[in-house]
Amino acid sequence: MDNVLPGDSDLFPNISTNSSESNQFVQPAWQIVLWAAAYTVIVVTSVVGNVVVMWIILAHKRMRTVTNYFLVNLAFAEASMAAFNTVVNFTYAVHNEWYYGLFYCKFHNFFPIAAVFASIYSMTAVAFDRYMAIIHPLQPRLSATATKVVIFVIWVLALLLAFPQGYYSTTETMPGRVVCMIEWPEHPNRTYEKAYHICVTVLIYFLPLLVIGYAYTVVGITLWASEIPGDSSDRYHEQVSAKRKVVKMMIVVVCTFAICWLPFHVFFLLPYINPDLYVKKFIQQVYLAIMWLAMSSTMYNPIIYCCLNDRFRLGFKHAFRCCPFISAGDYEGLEMKSTRYLQTQGSVYKVSRLETTISTVVGAHEDEAEEGPKATPSSLDLTSNGSSRSNSKTMTESSSFYSNMLA
């Protein structure tokens, strides 16, 4: 994401308002090379990683779940932002000259807001889906059609939020160069501009992060506190360990997003408090570093999936099997694990009325098996119904599939 808040002309006032001065932000060649290498890492890692994530989900039928469709949307938004905006924003920040014309100036300021909105609200949808599956397992789940409708609505809202910044973007010719800037309607104290920037910051950072944090906190506490009375088997402890891994993964995802984007939003809100800070020469290096950190958020999710989820790890190994230092692994596991689980589920379904209810809950969440937390409703329901040790053991056998996948 680039000019989500003030445009570069607002960030570096002298490049658009003082045409008689030379460009004080010109960098030595060695600095440009280092920054170019750093931004290249983001583009390559993000585009390749997120494309592989989309392939893993869309090319394997058992991976096409409600949650994973949101992950596809998240991966698409992040890969698109890395591909279409990172390099352009880097060259503009380094040279302070716009080479790409009026249309791309508007797109350059418009698309990042839409992409970040789609990304964070895809994460929010995943958090809500997790919350409902674990805290309210008997409530109806989203269908595939409803999931696609939600994704469509997310993008419509994203485009509407981004429209003003794209609409008011324009290019202006200065002596010796062209700049891309945002010309907001004139109003005392820049009221429209401030209101829009604050609104964007709240909607694409603070509000969704608050919702995600609450949902995952409740889910994490519920998972951590869940116990099965009378069952102290090794398999039970494996399940507890798997649940803790899921909680750690949630914390990693949320904290990664928060850490990457917080400096960016603070940086672009500071002009309203101390505008003189942004005419200092060192501010360009600060801006490049903060923008790199924010843009790097697009490349971390594939790494997190690969490290913390067995199915994604298998998919990545297969995608990069041509590399001499990567073993292909059990690629058939992407499909076969679900088949084996269906057989286990069938045996559980026939045991008793109580276990019929339990297996129905598990069956409703079978499509989420690859992500782990969906195993929780079965164990939680088992605790609340006070089932016997034999019932608990039977349930442990079926839900151990989830534990094995997250081990």
From Swiss-Prot:
Topology in the lipid bilayer: Multi-pass membrane protein
Name the UniProt record assigns to this protein: Substance-P receptor
Family from the record: Belongs to the G-protein coupled receptor 1 family.
Cytoplasmic compartment spans: 55-64, 129-148, 220-248, 309-407
Ranges of biased composition (kind: Polar residues): 376-407
One cellular-component annotation, GO: plasma membrane
List of glycosylated residues: N14, N18, N89, N189
Function according to Swiss-Prot or TrEMBL: This is a receptor for the tachykinin neuropeptide substance P. It is probably associated with G proteins that activate a phosphatidylinositol-calcium second messenger system.
Cellular location(s): Cell membrane
Residues exposed to the Extracellular side: 1-31, 87-106, 170-194, 271-283
Biological process, per Gene Ontology: positive regulation of flagellated sperm motility; regulation of uterine smooth muscle contraction
Record-annotated disulphide pairs: C105-C180
Listed transmembrane segments: 32-54, 65-86, 107-128, 149-169, 195-219, 249-270, 284-308
Disordered, as annotated region: 365-407
Taxonomy of the source species: Eukaryota, Metazoa, Chordata, Craniata, Vertebrata
Subunit comment: Interacts with ARRB1.
PROSITE patterns referenced in this protein's UniProt entry, alphabetically: G_PROTEIN_RECEP_F1_1, G_PROTEIN_RECEP_F1_2
Signal peptide interval: none
Alphabetical list of Gene3D superfamilies matching this protein: Rhodopsin 7-helix transmembrane proteins
Record-level Gene Ontology MF annotations: substance P receptor activity
